[in-house]
């Protein structure tokens, strides 16, 4: 019982420091100061230690790590900045974001529904504000945040709720829950609401074969099928940062109209392949790589609580 209580307190303290206190402090400071602090923290091996060490070991098996120390630094930096961005999105204006944000490409003109699709890579929160500024409402897709599954992890549960609330506020629409099936998603699209999601989620079913990093792999095809049925375009996007300055870049791909599912899946895979080759340390889901690269049954793979967030 004593060990259990001690471990629980240790987990809560880690969440308090890594997801609340330090990210909020960095977000409250002028960016040139805040990011300097973020870089210093990212050089500390104790920061996100368990997650980064596990990620590094898996990524090395897939041959994407040239410099382990650099990879670990960038992993820690992306984890930290991802949490900082929640507070920046809550507290900072569009004008502030524009000073630190470059955009390559444009969201499609008009206000018609689309599926904005990415992967758990980089620091994508700022893309939400960009999409909303284009005049579109969107609903983030999410797993349900079950309080019982967060037993003994109150701060992590509150963090997940805060993150979901920010997606709702920015998108001006409630979340749509993956577990409710495709009908709520289809209704949202038919009502002119965009969907925002990532497709590198293991264990959801409907996987189709693709090639990633010159290996056989698989990715879920549900969003591709949904876009085809709803006759709405898919727009792939990615957000990453300059690790030296913290400046972000949003890449918006041309709209993809699904007429051939296999071709659409290959397009999705090529987008992820580019991400993994460009900045492999930016992928937050290396822990689930074996499920995608056919080294494990994806149906048996479940998201860790720390990854059950809508964006």
Where are these regions (language model features)?
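Short, contiguous strand/loop micro-motifs
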Residues: 43, 114-115, 172, 209-212, ...
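Short acidic-hydrophobic, aromatic-tinged amphipathic segments that line or gate anion-handling sites
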Residues: 98-104, 172-179, 256-257
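Non-catalytic C-terminal accessory region of glycerolipid acyltransferases
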Residues: 108, 133, 137, 177-311
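Short glycine-/small-residue-rich flexible loop motifs, especially phosphate/cofactor-binding loops
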Residues: 56, 128, 165, 224, ...
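Residue-level preference for nonpolar/small residues embedded in alpha-helices
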Residues: 51, 123, 159-160, 181, ...
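Non-catalytic N-terminal targeting/anchoring module and adjacent flexible stem/linker
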Residues: 1-2, 311
């Amino acid at each position: 019982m004593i060990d259990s209580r001690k471990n629980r307190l240790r987990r809560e303290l880690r969440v308090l420091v890594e997801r609340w206190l330090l990210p909020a402090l960095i977000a409250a400071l002028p960016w040139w100061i805040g990011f300097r602090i973020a870089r210093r923290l990212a050089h500390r091996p104790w920061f996100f230690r368990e997650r980064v060490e596990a990620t590094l070991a898996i990524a090395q098996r897939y041959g994407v790590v040239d410099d382990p120390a650099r990879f670990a630094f960038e992993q820690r930096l992306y984890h930290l900045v991802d949490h900082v961005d929640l507070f920046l999105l809550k507290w900072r204006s569009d004008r502030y974001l524009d000073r630190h944000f470059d955009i390559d490409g444009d969201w499609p003109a008009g206000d018609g529904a689309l599926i904005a699709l990415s992967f758990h890579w980089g620091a994508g929160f700022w893309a939400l504000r960009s999409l909303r500024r284009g005049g579109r409402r969107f609903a983030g897709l999410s797993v349900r945040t079950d309080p019982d599954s967060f037993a003994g992890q109150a701060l992590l549960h509150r963090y997940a709720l805060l993150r979901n609330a920010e997606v709702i506020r920015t998108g001006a629409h409630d979340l749509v829950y993956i577990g409710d099936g495709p009908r709520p998603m289809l209704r949202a699209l038919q009502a002119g609401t965009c969907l925002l999601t990532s497709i590198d989620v293991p264990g959801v079913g409907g996987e189709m074969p693709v090639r990633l990093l010159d290996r056989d792999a698989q990715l879920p095809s549900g969003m591709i099928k949904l876009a085809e049925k709803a006759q709405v375009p898919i727009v792939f996007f990615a957000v990453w940062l300059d690790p030296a300055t913290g400046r972000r870049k949003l890449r918006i791909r041309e709209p993809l109209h699904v007429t051939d599912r296999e071709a659409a899946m290959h397009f999705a895979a090529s987008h992820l392949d580019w991400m993994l080759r460009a900045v492999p340390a930016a992928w937050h889901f290396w822990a689930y790589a074996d499920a995608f690269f056919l080294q494990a049954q994806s149906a048996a793979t479940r998201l860790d609580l720390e990854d059950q967030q809508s964006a």
